[in-house]
Amino acid sequence: MSIILGIDPGSRITGYGVIRQQGRHLQYLGSGCIRTSEKELPGRLKQIYAGVTEIITQFQPDVFAIEQVFMAKNADSALKLGQARGSAIVAAVNADLPVHEYAARLIKQAVTGTGGADKVQVQHMVQHMLKLPAKPQADAADALGVAICHANTNKTLVALAGKATSARKGRYR
């Protein structure tokens, strides 16, 4: 059993989603958005760090998963996104959490079955997969998608590691 904190970073709105993974079962624990109010970027980064730290304290996750930076057309936006990610990652590292990063296309693939899915499709599938009564906010749904992606990727890696161990045992008898 592990608790996974997923983060969809943004310099103005950072989504978060927390799930519990028990084998193949995923249970929704919480989600929402950290909305920054500061006008200047350093103040927003401080709010992101404080918000993620508070979420870590509240939910006590075992692992931290975050969306990777994608190359945006606007370099300034990409830099701000990278700084927002950094603030969230520092909060995780300060809490001694392992950090895992996933590309947006991989996250969408894990949740919807296609890497080109839009936000509405992600919201719908997250609601369905976690049996939520209503669609989560877009940024929170994306963050839950990050957590779901980690859970699915982690299950696959554990299964592959087990098969590799079994194969090695059989080979050296």
Curated annotation (Swiss-Prot):
Coiled-coil regions listed: none
Highest taxon listed in the record's lineage: Bacteria
Keyword Acetylation: no
E.C. code: 3.1.21.10
Main location: cytoplasm
Active site, UniProt feature: D8, E67, D139
Signal peptide region: none
Cofactor note: Binds 2 Mg(2+) ion per subunit.
GO molecular function: crossover junction DNA endonuclease activity; DNA binding; magnesium ion binding
UniProt KW Nuclease keyword: yes
Family that this chain belongs to: Belongs to the RuvC family.
Protein name according to UniProt: Crossover junction endodeoxyribonuclease RuvC
Natural source organism: Vibrio campbellii (strain ATCC BAA-1116)
